[in-house]
Every structure is written in C-alpha cells, then in structure tokens.
Amino acid sequence: MAPKGKVGTRGKKQIFEENKETLKFYLRIILGANAIYCLVTLVFFYSSASFWAWMALGFSLAVYGASYHSMSSMARASFSEDGSLMDGGMDLNMEQGMAEHLKDVILLTAIVQVLSCFSLYIWSFWLLAPGRALYLLWVNVLGPWFTADSGAPAPELNEKRQRRQERRQMKRL
C-alpha cells in the first residue's frame, strides 16, 4: 500500500550520493561491455575482425563518451568555499528527464555491442535510438504544434455591442 500524504523530497546530499552511484553503475556497464566486445571480437576472433568491427568499436566509444560526459556534467555538484555542499547537481534518477534518455542510450549501446560479438548485423538495432528520438520529437513538439488551433476564435458579439461598433465605424467615415 502506498504511503498516504505528500511524497517526501530528497535533499541535496542524497541526490549527490545517488548521482555518484548512478555514474559509477553506468561506468561499470560501459567498461564491461567494451571488455567483452574487445575480448571476443578483437582477441579471440582477431583474424576475422574487419574494418567494420573497429568502426563499431569507435562508434560505441563515441556514444558512450558523449552520453557519460553529458550525464556527469548534469550531475556536477557545487561546493562552497568551506567545502559544504551547495548544490547536488541535477537528479539523474528523475523520471522523464534527459538523463533517463542518456541512460537508455548507454544501455542500448551496451546490449547491441555485446550482441554484435555474434554478428555485425545486430548494429542495425541501434536505429531504435533515432527512432525513439523522432517519436519523442513528434509527440512532445511537432504533433501538438501541427494540430494546435491557429488562434483563438473571435468572440461572438451580442447584438447590442455589434450595433455600437457599427455606429462607431459610421462616425469615423
């Protein structure tokens, strides 16, 4: 049963600690996926490793680097001169936040990278990321913009106001 009342807010220190743990967790995922990929593809099957295997590794490293750097800059905390925590950074575990999408990109890349040890065609699953981005763009930005009313309809005037406006226009002429 859910607790009654207002949901408690989390303090700066708790957000700071959770952000550190989240970054550590995703760094482990990145290092683990790269270790598995390099071990299987570039060590065991070195003789059959093609140019595309190296390109896939470079692509995944670029995606990991950009995503992790964005997450760490979002979670950067600020401290006062005496060393006390002033701001714990943006909450990386916030639902529907940008960090959630970055974490999804890291997880998708790790899964695709490990599965691509069996076949390089698995990298086509990475097209899910731009597909999801286009979906979110349509649902949150473009769809409402295209389907929005062109403007507020003109308020209908009652007869008295309409006659008054007509008289004013006649006086101006």
UniProtKB/Swiss-Prot annotation:
It holds the Pfam family TMEM208_SND2. It is a multi-pass membrane protein. The modification N-acetylmethionine is found at residue 1. The keyword Membrane applies. GO terms for biological process: autophagy. InterPro entries: SND2/TMEM208 (IPR008506). The keyword Membrane applies. It comes from the Eukaryota. Disulfide bonds: none annotated. It is found in: Endoplasmic reticulum membrane. The chain crosses the membrane at residues 25-45, 51-68, 105-129. GO terms for cellular component: endoplasmic reticulum membrane. Keywords: Acetylation, Autophagy, Endoplasmic reticulum, Membrane, Transmembrane, Transmembrane helix. May function as a negative regulator of endoplasmic reticulum-stress induced autophagy. Belongs to the TMEM208 family. This is Transmembrane protein 208. It comes from Mus musculus (Mouse). The gene is Tmem208.
